[in-house]
Structure formats: C-alpha cells, structure tokens
Amino acid sequence: MIVILNNGGQYVHRIQRSLKYLDVPAKIVPNSTTLEEIAANPEIKGVILSGGPDITKATNCENIALNSELPVLGICLGHQLISKAYGGEVSRADSEEYASIKIYVKQENDLFKGVPSEFTAWASHMDEVKVTPDCFEVLAYSDICGVESIKHKEKSIYGVQFHPEVSHTEYGDIILKNFCKKCGFGFEE
C-alpha cells in the first residue's frame, strides 16, 4: 500500500484514484500521521506527500521526508517540503503556474523512464523550489520553473512540482507507475 499524506490540496483524491487505476492500493491519511505510525504498518511500501495551500500546515511531512526508509514522492507542496527539509529554498514563484506547461526532462532517470524528454503537464502553484539542496539533483524543468522535479542522490526520494495525477499531464500514469516500482510493486509490461 502507498499512503498519501493529505496536505489539503485539491487533487489529493486524484492521486488515490490514479494509483487505483494502476491496481496499487492507496490510502489517504491526515498529514498529522507520524513516521512511527507509518513504519509500524508492514503493508505500507511508499509515501506520497500531496499538494496543498500552506507549507506551514504540513505537520509531519518534513520529518517523514528526512527519516523515512520507504520511498517518498512529493507532489507540488510535497515537492517543496522535501526540498525545504533538506535545506533547499522555497519562495514565491516569479510567475504563478495555473495551466498546462511544457516539462523538459534533463536526462533519463528512474522516475521518468519511458517518458519523452519533453511533455505537457498540469501545474497549479504560487511557490516553487528556488535553491535545490546539495544532496538532490534536478531531473526536470520548465520555461518558468527551473526545478520541476528532483531526486535525492542516494535515497528513493523524489519531488515533482507539477501534478502527475491530473489527466492534463501526459505520461502522469507512467511517472506514478515508476514511483510505485521503486516501492516494490510489479507491473506486467
């Protein structure tokens, strides 16, 4: 099972639905859920930190990003929380994104395996990662956001600023499937 920490984002149920379409069991839990509660459940194979409107109300997400031994994917606010937890800088975007945008993948990697180097994704945010932590690499960018996706250099921790769970995002199902593979789920190819 994948647990989705609910940070109050408008698309949190779409994350669960997208995983259901992949036949991956998922459960939405409050963002007050602790790392200890997650670690105590052997059915949980990965964690998704959802989007949301307020970084100050994302209770336990930074602790989970820093200390979880399970794979973690941050989406939108979740992506920003991961970066902030590791010493990155998050602030108001130069240009707010509420539209379909072009994403450019810098190089093939495990999160974007099977995804072309350029694709359209849905973005909906006012803040963004401005400085990436040293222990992360930038996987993708757009014309108006230099950090659309990141990966920890040693752990299975990923972040995407855009929304792979929204139907407007091309290859969003493949991106989510690739994360689920990192969590140990198998898929027939």
UniProtKB/Swiss-Prot annotation:
**Catalyzed chemical reaction(s):** XMP + L-glutamine + ATP + H2O = GMP + L-glutamate + AMP + diphosphate + 2 H(+)
Entry keyword set: ATP-binding, Glutamine amidotransferase, GMP biosynthesis, Ligase, Nucleotide-binding, Purine biosynthesis
Q: How does it assemble?
A: Heterodimer composed of a glutamine amidotransferase subunit (A) and a GMP-binding subunit (B).
Query: Mind telling me what this protein is named?
Result: GMP synthase [glutamine-hydrolyzing] subunit A
Q: What does this protein do?
A: Catalyzes the synthesis of GMP from XMP.
Highest rank taxon of the organism: Archaea
Q: A Gene Ontology molecular-function term?
A: ATP binding
Species, as recorded: Methanococcus maripaludis (strain DSM 14266 / JCM 13030 / NBRC 101832 / S2 / LL)
The enzyme's E.C. designation: 6.3.5.2
InterPro entries in UniProt: Class_I_gatase-like (IPR029062), GATASE (IPR017926), GMP_synth_GATase (IPR004739), GMP_synthase_A (IPR023686)
| Residue stretches making up the Glutamine amidotransferase type-1 domain | 1-189
